[in-house]
Amino acid sequence: MKVGVIGAGTWGTALAQVLCDNNHDVFLLSTKEHQVNEINSLHKNSKYFGNEIFINEKIVATLSYETCVQDSDYIVLAVPTIAIRDVIHNLLPYIKKPTVFINAAKGFDVLTNKRLSVVIKELIPHDLLRGFASIIGPGHAEEVIIRKLTMITSTSLDIDIAKEVQLLFSNNYLRVYTNTDEIGAELGVAIKNVIAIASGILEGLDYGDNTRAALVTRGLHEIVRFGLFFGGKMETFMGLAGIGDLMVTCNSRHSRNYRAGVIIGKDDSSELFLKYNEETTEGVRTTRVVYELAKKHNIYMPIVTGMYKILYENAKPSDMIKDIINLPLKSEKE
């Protein structure tokens, strides 16, 4: 099978290697000529993985959309949410047959605040869309690239497509489960980034493990409350795209959102981070989207509200954490 992977960042490169390890013909699209040359000649992607990690030498990196996607059986979208629309616009002229599109991003559309699956399926003509799935869950690229055992989900409304993508990616170090709850899976992996920033802030403010465990647990309550309102299923939030992704993202140095929170916490302000940060930190935008939707539909989400005030109203993280801790006492079920 030919697979075109759009995006030569950490996750795109890691997924490209998985597919190459599974004996597929993989073309990896980059926007940077030096990165293409390094991948093809030295079999490294040093910007993201350093000089010590070598990647599968069969990966073919390219600057050309045509080379990457033409005649591909599958196309993997491994780019930040802000780039999804432009990427689809650029690749569509080269799609000549029905193709399965696989989304690997976590977040919301930048123009409409819709879930990514909804927008991607709207942008691709029906006669070119053989199927759609999301490959998501608790998978840090830094571990997948060195072939550490990882488990994620192939999520699609069409169970046959979910199974097809499951087989495409599964091997002895990447175990893929299927899921048909598109709403729950997408909301779970998106909102957990907000909680991960909050967890990092606690670390930056020198709170302990007890505090972070409590915050992450209460954060799961908020994810479930929001997700159920919009049609997600409880079992999804208890699975890999829910609590699984939440656990790994809220506690790992590999998580950009967690690292962002640590910086914000140490500064006791988001101002410098937002001004100078160059990494893709999806949780920042997701905070605004989820806050606005929760406010519109009267969904109780105090952690998300506090994060919105920190990121968008320049509230002091230390004050917001105290406000959350001092909320009225209630049952844990609430």
Q: Residue locations for each model-derived region?
A:
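Internal alpha-helical scaffold of NAD(P)-dependent oxidoreductase catalytic cores
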Residues: 83, 94, 123-131, 149-197, ...
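Rossmann-like NAD(P)(H) cofactor-binding subdomain of soluble oxidoreductases
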Residues: 55, 62-70, 74-147, 165
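NAD(P)-dependent Rossmann-like dehydrogenase/reductase catalytic/cofactor-binding core
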Residues: 199-200, 228-238, 242-334
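Conserved active-site and cofactor/substrate-binding residues in soluble primary-metabolism enzymes
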Residues: 6, 10, 14, 34, ...
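Structural beta-sheet core signal
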Residues: 5, 28, 101-103, 134, ...
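NAD(P)+-binding Rossmann beta1-loop-alpha1 motif at the extreme N-terminus of oxidoreductases
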Residues: 1-53, 59-63, 90
